[in-house]
From Swiss-Prot:
This is Coiled-coil domain-containing protein 138. It comes from Homo sapiens. The modification Phosphoserine is found at S49, S469. Disulfide bonds: none annotated. Pfam families: CCDC138_C (PF21035), CCDC138_cc (PF21037). It comes from the Eukaryota. The gene is CCDC138. The modification Phosphothreonine is found at T48.
Length: 665
């Protein structure tokens, strides 16, 4: 940006008027030089002082200062002019101008700083004006001298003299000086106006400076606020990131929990489907059995009706044959009397060794065929062996169905047989009954089984025997055959199991379970329990419907869990689907007695120690039921809590510290 030179208003006009008035312009070569001198001097000042131009460029203050300097330069030749006019008159004006020109030229060559030289010349010119004014005005009055001196000392102050006094002063001065004075007075007024403008501009600059300071402070406050906002934004972003991470972790945790719940739901659904299929199968079997029972009832009624018809026909034919005989009535009476005691006539076999031979065969069949059926079933592989074995099993079951009524009838002869032969006979009956468990229920066997159970429970009592030979006669002495109440432990144990299989009366079953618990307290009783595979017999009564017997059933199983050599075989015998299904159904029963639950938890705790049983626990969801019972059980029931925690720990569902915490209270 180039510096801007501001000239005081009217400067060029004043200089030109002075030049024209004093004959310095135009025709005279000397005057031409004088004007050229001032022009060249002015141009040189504006071009040779870049520092001053840089300082005062583009500013009103700078322009006003330049104007004051130039006015001083204009007054310098005028001051010298006043001096030469007063001393040498007007004739020597040109010489004084030429001398002044030479003097200023020498000063400009010597001086380095233009601003210093101009200030010195200005001060010198004012002093010369004062010196010239003093001798010229000695003849005038004192007020006029004071007025002139005041005007010379303070050219920037406004003139306070009235116009009349100024006119008087002009009249006393020469005409040219008066004009110069007027022009100087006008310049003075203009300078005052410029000073006022400069003061006003300075005030505006001060206001602008204060405004800029306020804006700067406001800007600083805004910057501080922005910095605080940035800090808050960073903190908000950090908190948001933390919350986002927490949210992601929580979502992941809930996703895992949802997956576990879905797995558990799938397991429950599969178990429910399995139970539903089993229920449908049982319903189908029940319908088939009902249909078969209905057909058999119809057939039995037909047979009974036919039998009645045959009896009537036989009686009618007999009467017709004996019609002419006088003994007809007597024979009819004898026939009726013979029909009743036919079933009650007991005859002793001529050879007692036949029973011994039969008992040997019974032992052999029981030990090597009937009792081995389930073991062979578990060992079969492939479809053909299974089909072959199924046919064999059906044949065995049919034979057992045919033999059991005959065996029940033979119980009436047991009082007349050696007591040692009772055990093989009862064992054969027991294993025949066990064969019927795997097959369909036979409605025709209901009455036979009930009679068999009552005879085994009560025993057989007979008054005596009759022999056809007149040589032998036996006194009618009562004889008994005790089975359930026998003093022989193996016979009593087998009789108890038969009673549990056949009898439905609650009082008979309660006495049977009491006898079984007493027998299981001995080591021989536990061995017999395992030998005769009594677990399925006991499990048939382990249901919530028989609440009165439930405690006795659990007690009999609990006797087998006592530490002995029979414990491990008993646990292996219980490690099957039948036992775990029965326990699962029992645990689902609402409001199960606390004592029964504690006893059952002991058995489950011992079964959980076998690793292979973990699959059975999971298959029948017993572990979930135990967890639910553990959650809802009162902590005051410490024994139950300890057993549940131990069972869950063996299954790998809880940690060791849970056992310690539960046992500590």
């Amino acid at each position: 940006m180039e510096p801007r030179v501001v000239k005081p208003p009217g400067q060029d006009l004043v200089v030109e008027s002075l030049k024209s008035r004093y004959g310095l312009g135009g025709s005279c070569p000397d005057e031409y030089d004088f004007s050229n001198f001032y022009q060249s001097k002015y141009k040189r000042r504006t071009l040779t002082s870049p520092g001053d131009l840089d300082i005062y460029s583009g500013d009103k203050v700078g322009s006003s200062l330049k104007y004051s300097d130039e006015s001083k330069h204009c007054r310098t030749p005028l001051g010298s002019l006043f001096k030469h006019v007063n001393v040498n008159c007007l004739d020597d004006e040109l010489d004084s101008f030429h001398d002044l020109k030479k003097q200023e030229t020498e000063e400009e060559l010597i001086e380095n700083d233009y601003r210093v030289s101009t200030s010195k010349i200005t001060k010198q010119s004012f002093k010369e004006i004062e010196k010239v004014a003093l001798p010229t005005n000695t003849t005038s009055s004192r007020p006029r001298t004071e007025c002139c001196s005041d005007a010379g000392d303070s050219p920037l102050k406004p003139v306070s003299c009235p116009k009349s006094k100024a006119s008087d002063k002009r009249s006393l001065l020469p005409h040219q000086i008066s004009q110069i004075y007027d022009e100087l007075f006008q310049i003075h007024l203009k300078l005052q106006c410029e000073t006022a403008a400069q003061q006003k501009f300075a005030e505006e600059l001060q206001k602008r400076e204060r405004f800029l300071l306020e804006r700067e402070q406001l800007l600083f406050r805004h910057e501080n606020a922005l910095s605080k906002i940035k800090g808050v934004e960073e903190e908000v972003l950090t908190r948001f990131q933390i919350i986002k991470e927490q949210h992601d972790a929580e979502v992941e945790h809930l996703t895992e929990v949802l997956k576990e719940k879905n797995k558990e739901t799938k397991r429950l659904r599969s178990s429910f489907d399995a139970l539903k299929e089993l229920n449908d199968t049982l319903k189908k079997q029940l319908n088939e059995a009902s249909e078969e029972n209905r057909k058999i009832d119809i057939q039995a009624k037909r047979v009974q009706a036919r039998l009645d018809n045959l009896q009537r026909k036989y009686e009618f034919m007999t009467i017709q044959r004996l019609k002419g005989s006088s003994h007809a009535v007597h024979e009819m009476k004898s026939l009726k009397q013979e029909k009743a005691p036919v079933s009650k006539t007991y005859k002793v076999p001529l050879n007692g060794q036949v029973y011994e031979l039969l008992t040997v065969f019974m032992d052999w069949i029981s030990d090597h065929h009937l009792s081995k059926v389930k073991h062979e079933e578990s060992g079969m592989d492939g479809k053909k062996p299974q089909l072959k074995f199924a046919s064999q099993r059906n044949d065995i079951q049919e034979k057992c169905v045919k033999l059991l009524p005959l065996m029940t009838e033979q119980l009436q002869w047991m009082p007349f047989v050696n007591i040692k032969l009772h055990e093989p006979f009862v064992k054969f009956i027991y294993w025949s009954l066990r064969q019927l468990d795997a097959g369909a229920q036979h409605s025709t066997m209901t009455s036979t089984l009930r009679r068999l159970g009552e005879d085994i429970f009560k025993g057989v009592v007979t008054k005596g025997i009759q022999d056809n030979s007149p040589q032998h006669s036996v006194e009618n002495k009562p004889k008994t055959a005790a089975f359930f109440k026998s003093s022989n432990l193996p016979l009593r144990f087998l009789s108890t199991l038969i009673v549990l299989k056949t009898v439905t009366q609650a009082d008979y079953l309660a006495q049977a379970f009491d006898s079984l618990c007493l027998d299981l307290k001995t080591e021989e009783g536990k061995t017999l329990f395992l030998e005769y595979q009594a677990v399925p017999v006991i499990l048939s009564h382990l249901r919530i419907s028989s609440k009165g017997l439930l405690s006795n059933v659990i007690d009999s199983l609990l006797q087998m869990t006592v530490e002995s050599k029979s414990l491990q075989p008993f646990l292996e015998a219980c490690s099957n689907s039948l036992f775990f299904r029965t326990c699962s159904v029992l645990l689902r029963a609402p409001k199960l007695d606390l004592q029964i639950l504690e006893k059952l938890s002991i058995i489950l705790q011992k079964l959980s120690k076998i690793k292979s049983n973990k699959k059975l626990f999971e298959l029948f969801t017993i572990h979930l039921m135990l967890q639910e019972i553990q959650r809802t059980t009162n902590p005051e029931h410490a024994f139950l809590c300890i057993n549940l925690n131990s069972t869950l720990f063996n299954l790998g569902l809880t940690k060791c510290n849970s056992l310690v915490s539960s046992a500590s209270p």
